[in-house]
Curated annotation (Swiss-Prot):
Molecular function as annotated in GO: chitin disaccharide deacetylase activity; deacetylase activity; metal ion binding
Subunit structure as annotated in this protein's UniProt entry: Homodimer.
Domain of life of the organism encoding this protein: Bacteria
Protein's UniProt name: Chitooligosaccharide deacetylase
Required cofactor names: Mg(2+)
Lineage, top ranks: Bacteria, Pseudomonadati, Pseudomonadota, Gammaproteobacteria, Enterobacterales
Positions contributing to Mg(2+) binding: H61, H126
Gene3D superfamilies the UniProt entry points to: Glycoside hydrolase/deacetylase
One BP annotation, GO: diacetylchitobiose catabolic process
Pathway(s) per entry: Glycan degradation; chitin degradation
Assigned keywords, A-Z: Carbohydrate metabolism, Chitin degradation, Cytoplasm, Hydrolase, Magnesium, Metal-binding, Polysaccharide degradation
The encoding gene: chbG
One Pfam family per UniProt: YdjC
Organism of provenance: Serratia marcescens
Length: 253
């Protein structure tokens, strides 16, 4: 029996360069799903592109560490009203307002529906904030209330001793196709790792992009372009099929 592989491109809506990279990797490569940052500078552009490619499965990339929230979040923003990676520091200090986070999740979900004209296929998050122990239960409950699958790093959940309420997700999640050593060999190594663990469904995270002013400011910049090259390599799709995987989306779970 064929195993399900979801190659999900994160950060759709971050910028035009990111958006065009996602579309290129979907049209001419192995990307089979994406997740959108509705507070990103390229969110409107992403929505416009999605209307040209209605078959592209799009989920919600919940954001608590980038840009500005869609509503008031005094417990998380800095003096400029911006979100950032200080979320973890504030979480450790017990300074998170879960009510604010839940309300922002509702706002971003509603914004997604307004932008894309449909509900998301699933939910994940920028910088994996939904796997933070205080935040995870509310995101899981929200996804279940909406009848949506959720990205789940089961190894991380076990390490953090999260109490899972049987969320709909893949057997395995892999974030290892990332960094300065991106290659087709690395992608296939990550695939083999999941296969060895007996996963019947796997989500592989990626960030293919063309470079633009926004991407050039990112700490993770040029590897996005290398990811795009690898994900659109003519040999990769065949190699995936040879290993018994079928490309799909969270709608196939």
């Amino acid at each position: 029996m064929e195993k399900l592989l979801i190659v999900n491109a994160d950060d759709f809506g971050l910028s035009k360069g990111q958006n065009y990279g996602v579309i290129e990797a979907y049209q001419h490569g192995v990307v089979s799903s994406t997740t959108a940052m509705v507070n990103g500078g390229g969110a409107q552009h992403a929505a416009a592109l999605s209307r040209q490619y209605p078959g592209l499965p799009i989920g919600l990339h919940f954001v608590l560490t980038h840009g500005k929230p869609l509503g008031a979040m005094p417990s998380l923003v800095n003096e400029h009203g911006e979100l950032g990676k200080w979320l973890w520091r504030r979480a450790e200090a017990g300074e998170l307002s879960l009510d604010e986070i839940h309300e922002e999740l509702q706002r971003q979900f509603a914004r997604f529906v307004t932008l894309f004209g449909r509900p998301p296929t699933h939910i994940d998050s920028h910088h994996h904030v939904h796997m933070q122990p205080q935040i995870y239960p509310l995101v899981e409950a929200f996804a279940q209330a909406q009848g949506l699958p959720l990205r789940l790093d089961r190894e991380e959940a076990k390490r953090r001793e999260l109490a899972l309420q049987t969320p709909c997700s893949t057997d395995a999640f892999d974030a290892g196709f990332y960094g300065e050593m991106i290659s087709e060999a690395l992608f296939l190594q990550r695939l083999a790792r999941a296969d060895e663990q007996g996963a019947e469904s796997l989500e592989m995270m990626c960030h293919p992009a063309f470079l633009d002013a926004t991407i050039l400011q990112s700490k993770y910049c040029h590897p996005r372009l290398v990811e795009l090259d690898v994900l659109t390599a003519p040999t990769l799709k065949a190699a995936i099929a040879e290993r018994g995987f079928l490309l799909g989306s969270f709608q196939d779970l």
